[in-house]
Amino acid sequence: MLSNTSILPPSFFFCLVLYYGCLWYISGPRMRARGFRLPPGPPQMFLTGNLHDLSTKARTEPWLTFTAWSRAYGPVVYFRVLNQKTVLLNSGKVALDLLESRSAIYSDRPTFWMGELAGRKWSVFLISSLEPRFRLFRRLLQNGLNPRASKSYRPIQTQEAQILLQGLANSPRNFASHIRRVPQLASRLRGTRPYWIEFLPILRFVPAWFPGAGFKRTTFEIGPKLSQTEDIPPEWAQEQIATGNFIESFTSKHLLGLGDVKILNQSSPDDIKWCAGALYVGGGDTTVSALKSFVLLVALHPDIQKRAQEDIDSITPNRLPTHDDFDSLPFIRAIVKETLRWAPVAPLGIPHRVIRDDIYENYFIPKGSRVIANIWAITHAEELYPNPGAFDPSRYLPGDHKFQPDPFKFVFGFGRRVCPGAHLAEMSLFLNMASILAVFKISKDVDVNGVEIEPEIAWTTGTTRHLKPFRCQIMPRSKEHLSLLG
């Protein structure tokens, strides 16, 4: 479960485990005195809690382990690693009850110590909801990313979609690199598994030269690079504005003072930089991961691909789809939804933190607990989405089937932490998916004998997940369709 960059002395860990175990033991009477019990969960060891449960499977695909726990213990599950308390929410109802209806106390973030050491305290994704700057960030993002404001970014989205199509036409084998055109630095801070410092914050005082302190050297390396990356949007926008010939973007809009004057008067250039950097560094992950999943899914389901292309041809026979075709292509919109349901980009989201003791369904939820919504479990719940393992966009279209909720209620987060760019992401995915289907046919790869090769479905591990490299064929549907690229 834990990063093994190097090993700290066993005696050092023994002292730390003993210290945090005592903290946990002292806090126990407070919970028992209230007369409520903690949510059920796997049995714990006296000092280390559930550290032993975080096996290889829990490390690589924790959402599956947590889903199995929910089948054994119910939709609300409690576990502990040392003194770190965690509450899992494994159903849509529970997640909405707590993270939406009680968002006033469930919208904080637990301290991400690797981020703190790398100078990421003010990151939009990590900032505490108790900080005044948190509200300003939310207002800035809502000001620049609401559906009305997002219309001004359509030229940029169209330009990016055309670059993607040209890349696929020129080198279809490199489709993954054409899709991924955003930085990957932030993911290195979280790593493929948590670092010890996330469970033992006292390790932040260990000097970087100390054996086992490789995590500190990682933050010293990545922190400055992330800061440089976040300087790109404002510097680029300022250069474009100076020429007088620029496409409006989130950054240029705010640098020029467009939008809500009250919000802009309260913000500084650093505030704008942090918000723009969040979109640049992290915001693209949703689009990138979803597009990779989309390529795989349409390769595996030629019938769905054919139906989508027939719809596109009927609406845009002699041109590429645009944003204006959004309402006319409900099946493409359904493909966007089903892709994000079947393959949620962040299966566990980013943890929340409850800022005071709470009671839910007679369960005691301790102040300071991490609260994790198991988005994968929610979007694969049989009671919400019958036959959840099937990729079936028609489940969101009118028909003689049970109503199935819009997965956007879950996959973009909850409450005050809901992704403010959800609408922008949906429009970007719609445009890219529709454009790819308009021009190309995607199918399974074949071997030298012409026999189809089943693509291997494997995922990276982290806060956001991506499909590992897989093989497929991407070819123009015809010369006429290829000519749509101009």
Residue ranges of predicted features:
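Conserved cytochrome P450 K-helix E-x-x-R motif and the immediately C-terminal K′/meander segment
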Residues: 53-67, 72-74, 202-206, 225-228, ...
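C-terminal helix/juxtamembrane-tail motif
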Residues: 1-6, 20, 465-486
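N-terminal membrane-proximal hinge/A-helix region immediately C-terminal to the signal-anchor transmembrane segment
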Residues: 2-122, 132, 136, 158-163, ...
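Cytochrome P450 heme-binding "Cys pocket" and the immediately downstream C-terminal segment
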Residues: 302-305, 422-463, 475
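Cytochrome P450 catalytic-domain helical core, especially the substrate-recognition surface
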Residues: 43-67, 85, 112-236, 252-256, ...
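Cytochrome P450 heme-thiolate "Cys pocket" and heme-binding signature region
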Residues: 323, 397-429, 455-461
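Conserved cytochrome P450 K-helix/beta-meander segment immediately N-terminal to the heme-binding cysteine loop
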Residues: 357, 373-400
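Central I-helix of cytochrome P450 enzymes
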Residues: 187, 222-233, 260-311, 339, ...
